[in-house]
């Protein structure tokens, strides 16, 4: 029996892949008894050959049931997504960098990692400037940009203190001088441009 517009396409298409022994209709191994922690590697993997050989027993069942791929998506929705693991090379670089830091730099690094601008405050400031509601993602991004900006100003001020031979509790004049030095580098937008026309 042929269905669809293509010839040679049988009604027995698009269902459960062949070769999934020991799995229930959702593709979950029966030996796990509902525990999805440790799936068997070989038995329940969906391979590209299996996707091409999908079969179904009857037309009514295929029309009412969602495809196998869609069932898999809904099954994994409730599970925690695993975070991608960090490369060993990246971890090695980070440990090398941290071991090369002095005590002062390490304490500053830890404080910098822990600090963050409050998202609600950033969103309210952005709303007062734009006059529109601000999406949460935009407030988070702006808070991150502000943190980087403050870090650059502080680093410039610390470099100036080191150049002048001063000790690090930064004074307001050091921060003002750092801002003045960063303006020509293009870090600050110039608000005082004259409009020619």
Swiss-Prot record:
<comment type="similarity">
    <text>Belongs to the TAF11 family.</text>
</comment>
<dbReference type="InterPro" id="IPR009072">
    <property type="entry name" value="Histone-fold"/>
</dbReference>
<dbReference type="GO" id="GO:0051123">
    <property type="term" value="P:RNA polymerase II preinitiation complex assembly"/>
</dbReference>
<dbReference type="Pfam" id="PF04719">
    <property type="entry name" value="TAFII28"/>
</dbReference>
<dbReference type="InterPro" id="IPR006809">
    <property type="entry name" value="TAFII28_dom"/>
</dbReference>
<feature type="region of interest" description="Disordered">
    <location>
        <begin position="59"/>
        <end position="88"/>
    </location>
</feature>
<dbReference type="GO" id="GO:0046982">
    <property type="term" value="F:protein heterodimerization activity"/>
</dbReference>
<dbReference type="GO" id="GO:0005669">
    <property type="term" value="C:transcription factor TFIID complex"/>
</dbReference>
<dbReference type="InterPro" id="IPR045127">
    <property type="entry name" value="TAF11-like"/>
</dbReference>
<feature type="compositionally biased region" description="Basic and acidic residues">
    <location>
        <begin position="72"/>
        <end position="88"/>
    </location>
</feature>
<protein>
    <recommendedName>
        <fullName>TATA-box-binding protein-associated factor 11-like protein 14</fullName>
    </recommendedName>
</protein>
